[in-house]
Amino acid sequence: RTIDGSRDDTKDTLELEVMIKGFFNKELLLDYLQYFIGFEINGSKVVKKQAGYHQFHGVRAAVENTIKATSKTGDGRCGVFWHTQGSGKSFSMVCYAAKLMATMEMENPTLVIVTDRNDLDDQLFETFMINEELLRQKPIQAEGRNDLQQKLASRPTGGIFFTTMQKFKPEKGQSRYPILSERHNIVVMADEAHRSQYG
């Protein structure tokens, strides 16, 4: 582990020093407490979920890259946040959404979470619903193509929408899907992007 989450590992630094300087820094600690702890109800128990080291630093870097990518000089490409299986991707997505929604530079963005299967859409939507308090708003699942278009077109700011890739298929006779908005702060999060995204 390193103090700032970078790959520049300093072997001469004591582990305790890394923890104190890297986690008990006022800005980092407050950030962690605000955006990286969630609570889930499991039967009759309340379970606390906390982001791990890789999630905390990964989400912070992803938010920073998103701010740059959506700025006037940005290219609109926020990047890829890759996880191995079972390493907390869904919770990282929740933390990213929570932090991004509250980031002043993003001007109350709209998030569109895209999956390539209905079961994944339902599963991820449920994870976000469980963490509604952390997100400070209720996620919405689009029912169909027209529903998604209406929701995005009528939403000037904010909102977390779930949909599947199939809803972006062009209408019969069209070669491209129509532009839904010219806003710079609509962020698309593609789950399992390696299966359906390219370019």
Locations of regions flagged by a protein language model:
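ATP-dependent helicase/translocase motor core
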Residues: R1-T110, D119, Q123-L134, P156, ...
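A generic local structural motif
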Residues: A98-L100, N146-Q149, G173-R176
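Short beta-strand-centered segment that lines the nucleotide-binding/catalytic pocket of NTP-utilizing
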Residues: I113-T115
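Conserved helicase motor
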Residues: N118, I140-Q150, M165-P170
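Acidic/polar loop patches that form or flank catalytic/metal-binding clefts of enzymes
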Residues: L135-Q141, R195-S196
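Conserved motor-coupling elements within RecA-like helicase/translocase cores
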Residues: E143-F161, I179-L180
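Conserved RecA-like ASCE ATPase "motif II neighborhood" in helicase/translocase motors
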Residues: G158-E192, S196-G199
